[in-house]
Amino acid sequence: MTTKKTSSVVLPLLLVFALILMPMVAGQLKSTCRIAEAWKGAKECNAKCAALGTTRGGVCQKFLGDLYCCCWD
């Protein structure tokens, strides 16, 4: 009896949770990342992204020991 009650409550809650998360995941910004050996920080990365024509700038990220400059598309 308790299992039926619990499952009848949990399933609708999971559906509502999924409906809330779907727009969040779908609306994420896409970025193009390039290896940033020459860049030393965020200012250089933002300048490079501005030169490439992006309006939102960029961010430096370290991944597997390399520094990447990611420009928002």
UniProtKB/Swiss-Prot annotation:
On whether Cell division is a keyword of this UniProt record, the answer is no
The residues forming the signal peptide are: 1-27
GO biological process entries: defense response to fungus; killing of cells of another organism
**Under the cellular component aspect of Gene Ontology, which terms does the record hold?**
extracellular region
- Which cysteines link up through disulfide bonds? C33-C71, C45-C69, C49-C70
Cite the Pfam families for this sequence: AtDEF-like (PF25052)
- Primary site of residence: secreted
Tell me which domain of life the UniProt entry assigns to the organism this sequence originates from: Eukaryota
The cellular location(s) given in this protein's UniProt record come to: Secreted
Statement: the UniProt record of this protein carries the keyword Disulfide bond:
yes
Q: Which UniProt keywords apply?
A: Antimicrobial, Disulfide bond, Fungicide, Plant defense, Secreted, Signal
InterPro entries in the record, alphabetically? DEFL
**Family label:** Belongs to the DEFL family.
Name it.
Defensin-like protein 87
